């Protein structure tokens, strides 16, 4: 049975005290590029840092995943017959107890977004210190994500396959290193808004789709927030209307959810 393993490189003094992870999804190269750039930069690290490329076969193939979505099977099972289940278990073990930044990218949103679970207060505190405009608790709407594994901060760095997303990923990773004391540089200013994902709205079965509203903007009851194409590829085939006042978001796997703002000044 194949034993898939993440690619791991430890840098800095002593045992690893934190981790930076890219490549959970193989079609999101910004995190992998950020990891490689940081390794090539030969940083003067003040603490041990574990750099990880999570899913090398998917990265090499340029595919989101090969068999199962890795970011939906955590914490995984080391004895499972499914390769992603085994890989998830190894990734959890490699980052166990380490504050971790996991870097992703999206199809739609160019601004960075931090996601963390309040079940891990340290992760939520770290997310709030990153220079991102939004911090999102996705726990109620997403099962099996890496954020549920430990002290994990997920970063959506921007649009997939763009140089801007790779540059943002590196900047945010450097900010994470500064916030955690691994780099002896001032941490950048942060003042995010906080959101919580509440109700999952599955992506409709279609080759393509259109989000009709802006990310993180309020959606009034009755407003069309998304549509799918007809056979002639127009974007009026099927419309989806909000049944309540909410905030719509879209992530790389499609139109996923509606979110409600939570007001919390806590860091």
Please describe what each predicted stretch is.
Residues 1-267:
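Structured catalytic-domain cores with a bias toward divalent-metal coordination
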């Amino acid at each position: 049975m194949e034993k898939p393993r993440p690619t791991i490189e430890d840098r800095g003094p002593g045992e690893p005290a934190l981790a930076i992870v890219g490549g959970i999804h193989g079609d999101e190269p910004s995190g992998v590029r950020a990891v490689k750039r940081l390794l090539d930069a030969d940083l003067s690290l003040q603490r041990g840092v574990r750099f990880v490329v999570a899913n090398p076969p998917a990265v090499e193939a340029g595919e989101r995943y090969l068999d199962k979505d890795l970011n939906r099977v955590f914490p995984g099972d080391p004895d499972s017959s499914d390769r992603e289940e085994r890989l998830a278990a190894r990734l959890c073990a490699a980052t166990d107890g380490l504050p971790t930044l996991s870097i992703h990218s999206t199809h739609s949103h160019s601004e960075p977004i931090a996601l963390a679970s309040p079940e891990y207060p340290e992760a939520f505190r770290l997310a709030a210190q990153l220079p991102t405009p939004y911090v999102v608790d996705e726990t109620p709407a997403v099962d099996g994500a890496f954020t549920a594994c430990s002290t994990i901060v997920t970063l959506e760095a921007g649009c997939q396959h763009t140089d801007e997303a790779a540059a943002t990923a590196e900047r945010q990773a450097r900010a994470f290193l500064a916030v955690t004391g691994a780099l002896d540089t001032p941490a950048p200013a942060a003042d995010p808004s906080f959101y919580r994902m509440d109700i999952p709205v599955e992506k409709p079965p279609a080759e393509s789709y259109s989000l009709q509203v802006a990310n993180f903007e309020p959606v009034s009851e009755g407003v069309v927030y998304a549509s799918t194409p007809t056979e002639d590829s127009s974007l009026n085939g099927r419309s989806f209307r909000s049944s309540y006042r909410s905030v719509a978001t879209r992530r790389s796997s499609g139109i996923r959810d509606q979110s409600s703002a939570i007001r919390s000044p806590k860091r």
